[in-house]
Design a protein with these regions (language model features):
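Transmembrane alpha-helix signature in integral membrane proteins
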Residues: 1-18
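C-terminal transmembrane helix and the adjacent membrane-cytosol boundary/short C-terminal tail
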Residues: 17-18, 25, 99-110, 114, ...
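Membrane-interfacial helix termini and adjacent extracytoplasmic/periplasmic loops
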Residues: 25-29, 45-87, 121, 157-160
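Transmembrane alpha-helices
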Residues: 35, 39, 88, 95-98, ...
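Membrane-cytosol interface at the C-terminal ends of specific transmembrane alpha-helices
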Residues: 75-114, 139-140
């Protein structure tokens, strides 16, 4: 859930930044940030672990040289590493949903916020985010489900004794314990139905208006 929440928050800032600064460099930066969804989870995991491992080695070398101690793994094999990979992997999903919500907010709302003396950050917090509650919730649920069923990146980056439903299902199924794996597999399926039900209700309410 934390990874999904961080992904939505980053998407809000990127989407709003693109809205108020529609420059070519900003647009390219946003599109580059959302390229992770087109890459396999394994590729992203390797792309995360290489710089993190390099950083850990450098810090360990410095600690050994100056203090005679080993710092161990600071980033590699931590919850931070796996959350970072999740955000890179699924940022495009939340960004697309947030941008869709921002397109529904008329530019006159930005003009009204500026006329009231709101700075861009204040306009985002007091005007746009309240209007983006539905889009943000949709993005949160979709990314949460995607994170829940992500397997390759989780297997490579997860800390010791850290399991997700996808990993648990994979381990039990690999051991031919199909009956035991069905519980966690069913939980993933049921979680995947939540955004579908929510979106169906939202669409129905929109049509009735």
């Amino acid at each position: 859930f934390s990874a999904a929440l961080v992904s939505v928050i980053v998407a809000l800032f990127l989407g709003y930044g693109k809205r108020i600064l529609p420059e070519k460099m900003m647009i390219i930066s946003v599109r580059t940030a959302s390229i992770g969804y087109a890459l396999p989870g394994t590729v992203i995991a390797v792309g995360v672990i290489i710089p993190f491992a390099w950083f850990d080695r450098k810090i360990d070398s410095l600690m050994g040289s100056y203090f005679g101690i080993s710092s161990g793994l600071i980033l590699s094999g931590t919850i931070f590493a796996i959350m970072f990979a999740y955000v890179v992997r699924f940022l495009a999903v939340s960004l697309q949903t947030v941008e869709s919500g921002l397109e529904k907010i008329k530019p006159s709302m930005d003009d009204a916020a500026r006329s009231l003396g709101y700075r861009p950050r204040e306009a985002l917090m007091k005007v746009h985010i309240p209007l983006l509650k539905s889009s943000s919730l949709t993005a949160l649920m979709i990314v949460f489900v995607d994170v829940m069923k992500e397997l390759p990146a989780t297997l490579i980056l997860r800390p010791f004794d850290f399991n997700t439903l996808a990993v648990r299902t994979f381990e039990l199924a690999s051991d031919e314990r199909l009956a035991d794996s069905s519980t966690s597999a069913l939980a993933i399926v049921l979680a995947g139905l939540l955004p579908v039900i929510y979106l169906s209700q939202t669409i129905s309410k929109t049509r009735l208006k």
